[in-house]
Amino acid sequence: FSKKMCVELGYDSYGDVEYVPHVLRYYIANPETTVTNESADSILKELKENNTAPPEAWKVIEKGASLIGSVKYSMKKRQADGRDNPEFLDCSSFTAWSFHKSGITSVPYASNTGTFISSNKFEDISGDKLQPGDIGLKSKTGGTGGANHVGIYCGTLKNGTVVWIHCTSSSSTSLTGNSEGAMFGAYTNFTYFRRLKKWNKG
């Protein structure tokens, strides 16, 4: 747009040449979510039948599930810029993407695990109070990078399996057939839990 206006008006420069992409990263262009991975879609349906949560929480989980089978894990190559179809994310940018793309724009795309620990948009909860949409971290004090991990609680399946959606470099607890990247998993190493304040029922 800026280049076009330069030509039309005869200017050498015209504002921010990256203005349009800078604005569009905050625009949620596709509110409808499609989960293409069959295992993920089946698990998501069972989770919704077996658990209660605010509609906004399910939107977060659905957004994350839409990346299962397409997003690979990488801290170095993570594309934490809000693009619609990222190829690489790490645990925190995946969690942030899921929240932000579902409409909760107070969670920045470039979040790291430290962001989720310190954010005043979330508050601490105990593990026995978990509801779908809550987040879990390995540690309250762990640093960023490989020292910590974050994911989104999704509820339990009918057989009692506790399900998290997260993005990881490797996992032996995947429920969606992939051992790397975005997945539903029976992950058990989260010890610190937080909830978006507006979802807290008190």
Regions found by a protein language model. Name each.
Residues 76-82, 112-119:
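Short linear capping/connector segments at secondary-structure termini
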Residues 133-134:
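Structural motif
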Residues 3, 24-105, 141, 146, ...:
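N-terminal capping segments
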Residues 6, 11, 15-29, 35-41, ...:
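Aromatic- and glycine-rich peptidoglycan recognition patches
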Residues 97-117, 155:
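Short, basic/aromatic beta-hairpin or loop at an interaction surface
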Residues 129-130:
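Short, well-ordered loop/turn sites that connect or cap secondary structure elements
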